[in-house]
Amino acid sequence: MAIHLYKTSTPSTRNGAVDSQVKSNTRNNLIYGQHRCSKGRNARGIITAGHRGGGHKRLYRKIDFRRNEKDIYGRIVSIEYDPNRNASICLIHYGDGEKRYILHPRGAIIGDTIVSGTEVPIKMGNALPLTDMPLGTAIHNIEITLGKGGQLARAAGAVAKLIAKEGKSATLKLPSGEVRLISKNCSATVGQVGNVEVNQKKLGRAGSKCWLGKRPVVRGVVMNPVDHPHGGGEGRAPIGRKKPATPWGYPALGRRSRKRKKYSDNLILRRRSK
């Protein structure tokens, strides 16, 4: 998806760089309901993730992460915008009349055909088990649990690499740099997720960020002591602590957030690069 620059007629267009418009389809059976967000609050209404709220109303698009239409060819009918993710989505019409949305693989165009199964060609957009893929294949939408659907490498521009197969496991290098083991029977989609230029997008004005449901970010040092451990003091004051802290008093900037003794610890061969 190309990045579009406007004429510099106003400050917002002068500083903005947005992706070219991919229109949404009219409402169908795969687009339903208002996508209700928690706005960063938990069930008690307490803020657990800051700087979230507002934003435009969204409709949820049901995405087929399982790709369980086995050995039935489908054709890409349209490439559409999805407000719930950075990646674009494709509407697929299968030969048996089924219609589904999938993540848009990079380079796929309207009219291309895709298929999922065990003995299918190694072609962009096709889904098949890791055991049937050659080493070095670029993949996305990777299953962790067999039959649950893809959970890894689903963001815009994400791509993982199959680097080894031994025994019942396959070794993958993920976009974060992490190297981990996954069952060879799990499925993945060949290719890279589209919309790789999303990191070049520049909103240009505060209103555009407000539409996305993101609120302004305020530094803790300018808050009151009741609101943040860094707050308080007369005028410009230091944080008053040896190390920075979160609003709840926990160490910030470098503290590991992964749970200890997690079930997948023995599957991770190398931690992600920071």
UniProtKB/Swiss-Prot annotation:
Gene Ontology CC terms: chloroplast; mitochondrial large ribosomal subunit
Gene Ontology biological process terms, A to Z: mitochondrial translation
S-S bridge residues: none
Region (Disordered) location: 1-20, 223-274
Main subcellular location of this protein, as a coarse class: plastid
GO molecular-function terms, A-Z: rRNA binding; structural constituent of ribosome; transferase activity
Superkingdom of origin organism: Eukaryota
Localization, UniProt: Plastid, Chloroplast
Assigned keywords, A-Z: Chloroplast, Plastid, Ribonucleoprotein, Ribosomal protein
Family, similarity comment: Belongs to the universal ribosomal protein uL2 family.
Subunit structure: Part of the 50S ribosomal subunit.
Protein name: Large ribosomal subunit protein uL2cz/uL2cy
Organism: Eucalyptus globulus subsp. globulus
Gene that specifies this protein: rpl2-A
